[in-house]
From Swiss-Prot:
UniProt keyword Hydrolase present: yes
Family per similarity comment: Belongs to the protein-tyrosine phosphatase family.
Record lineage: Eukaryota, Metazoa, Chordata, Tunicata, Ascidiacea
Domain Tyrosine-protein phosphatase as annotated: residue spans: 1-114
Keywords tagged on the record: Hydrolase, Protein phosphatase
Protein name: Tyrosine-protein phosphatase 11
Residues annotated for substrate binding in this entry: D81
Amino acid sequence: WRMIWEHNTRNIIMLTQTVEKGKIKCDHYWPFDNEPIVSGDITIQMTSESMLPEWTIREFKITHGANTRRVRQFHYTVWPDHGVPETTETLVKFIRYVRRTIDGEAKHTGPTIV
Protein backbone atom coordinates (compact mmCIF):
# COMPACT_ATOMS: atom_id res chain seq x y z
CA TRP A 1 0.00 0.00 0.00
CA ARG A 2 2.96 2.29 0.58
CA MET A 3 4.02 1.88 -3.06
CA ILE A 4 0.45 2.59 -4.21
CA TRP A 5 0.41 5.75 -2.11
CA GLU A 6 3.90 6.95 -3.04
CA HIS A 7 3.33 6.48 -6.78
CA ASN A 8 -0.23 7.86 -6.77
CA THR A 9 -1.56 4.63 -8.26
CA ARG A 10 -5.31 4.61 -8.84
CA ASN A 11 -5.77 1.22 -10.54
CA ILE A 12 -4.65 -2.32 -9.69
CA ILE A 13 -5.12 -5.23 -12.09
CA MET A 14 -5.04 -8.72 -10.61
CA LEU A 15 -5.08 -11.80 -12.84
CA THR A 16 -4.61 -14.66 -10.38
CA GLN A 17 -6.40 -16.18 -7.45
CA THR A 18 -4.81 -15.94 -4.03
CA VAL A 19 -4.64 -19.75 -3.75
CA GLU A 20 -3.81 -22.27 -6.50
CA LYS A 21 -3.74 -26.02 -5.94
CA GLY A 22 -3.96 -25.40 -2.20
CA LYS A 23 -0.87 -23.16 -2.15
CA ILE A 24 -0.92 -19.46 -1.38
CA LYS A 25 0.17 -17.63 -4.55
CA CYS A 26 -0.74 -14.08 -3.59
CA ASP A 27 -1.35 -12.42 -0.26
CA HIS A 28 -4.92 -11.22 0.28
CA TYR A 29 -3.75 -7.62 0.58
CA TRP A 30 -7.17 -5.95 0.57
CA PRO A 31 -9.94 -5.89 3.20
CA PHE A 32 -12.45 -8.75 3.10
CA ASP A 33 -15.35 -6.36 3.77
CA ASN A 34 -15.93 -2.69 4.60
CA GLU A 35 -13.96 -2.95 7.86
CA PRO A 36 -10.74 -0.95 7.42
CA ILE A 37 -7.31 -2.55 7.65
CA VAL A 38 -4.08 -0.77 8.48
CA SER A 39 -0.77 -1.22 6.68
CA GLY A 40 1.91 0.85 8.38
CA ASP A 41 0.51 4.37 8.47
CA ILE A 42 -1.99 3.79 5.65
CA THR A 43 -5.62 2.81 6.27
CA ILE A 44 -7.47 0.87 3.58
CA GLN A 45 -11.25 0.52 3.46
CA MET A 46 -13.25 -1.24 0.75
CA THR A 47 -16.10 1.04 -0.28
CA SER A 48 -17.67 -1.16 -2.96
CA GLU A 49 -17.39 -4.59 -4.54
CA SER A 50 -19.09 -5.58 -7.80
CA MET A 51 -18.86 -9.31 -8.46
CA LEU A 52 -19.43 -10.14 -12.11
CA PRO A 53 -19.29 -13.62 -13.66
CA GLU A 54 -15.66 -13.32 -14.82
CA TRP A 55 -14.17 -10.49 -12.77
CA THR A 56 -14.70 -8.41 -9.67
CA ILE A 57 -14.29 -4.66 -9.33
CA ARG A 58 -13.40 -3.33 -5.88
CA GLU A 59 -13.12 0.30 -4.83
CA PHE A 60 -10.98 1.34 -1.88
CA LYS A 61 -10.54 4.49 0.12
CA ILE A 62 -6.95 4.76 1.28
CA THR A 63 -5.98 7.28 3.91
CA HIS A 64 -2.55 8.55 4.89
CA GLY A 65 -2.64 11.21 7.58
CA ALA A 66 -5.32 13.73 6.58
CA ASN A 67 -5.18 12.78 2.88
CA THR A 68 -7.53 10.34 1.16
CA ARG A 69 -7.47 8.77 -2.30
CA ARG A 70 -9.61 6.31 -4.23
CA VAL A 71 -8.07 3.15 -5.67
CA ARG A 72 -9.79 0.57 -7.85
CA GLN A 73 -8.90 -3.11 -8.21
CA PHE A 74 -9.87 -5.06 -11.34
CA HIS A 75 -9.68 -8.75 -10.39
CA TYR A 76 -9.97 -11.31 -13.20
CA THR A 77 -11.43 -14.29 -11.34
CA VAL A 78 -11.70 -17.08 -13.91
CA TRP A 79 -8.03 -17.81 -14.57
CA PRO A 80 -7.78 -21.59 -14.11
CA ASP A 81 -6.11 -23.12 -11.07
CA HIS A 82 -3.30 -24.43 -13.28
CA GLY A 83 -2.32 -23.53 -16.82
CA VAL A 84 -3.98 -20.92 -19.00
CA PRO A 85 -7.59 -20.22 -20.02
CA GLU A 86 -8.98 -22.48 -22.76
CA THR A 87 -9.89 -19.43 -24.84
CA THR A 88 -8.88 -15.80 -24.73
CA GLU A 89 -12.43 -14.48 -25.06
CA THR A 90 -13.06 -13.54 -21.42
CA LEU A 91 -9.54 -12.20 -20.92
CA VAL A 92 -9.87 -9.95 -23.98
CA LYS A 93 -13.25 -8.71 -22.69
CA PHE A 94 -11.64 -7.99 -19.32
CA ILE A 95 -8.76 -6.06 -20.90
CA ARG A 96 -11.17 -4.00 -23.01
CA TYR A 97 -13.32 -3.24 -19.97
CA VAL A 98 -10.30 -2.12 -17.94
CA ARG A 99 -8.98 0.06 -20.77
CA ARG A 100 -12.37 1.71 -21.33
CA THR A 101 -12.67 2.39 -17.62
CA ILE A 102 -9.23 3.89 -16.99
CA ASP A 103 -8.58 5.62 -20.35
CA GLY A 104 -10.62 8.70 -19.45
CA GLU A 105 -8.93 9.28 -16.11
CA ALA A 106 -6.75 12.25 -15.34
CA LYS A 107 -3.23 11.97 -16.69
CA HIS A 108 -1.70 13.09 -13.39
CA THR A 109 -2.33 9.74 -11.71
CA GLY A 110 0.44 7.21 -11.24
CA PRO A 111 1.03 3.91 -13.02
CA THR A 112 -1.42 1.04 -13.09
CA ILE A 113 -0.15 -1.94 -11.09
CA VAL A 114 -0.52 -5.42 -12.61
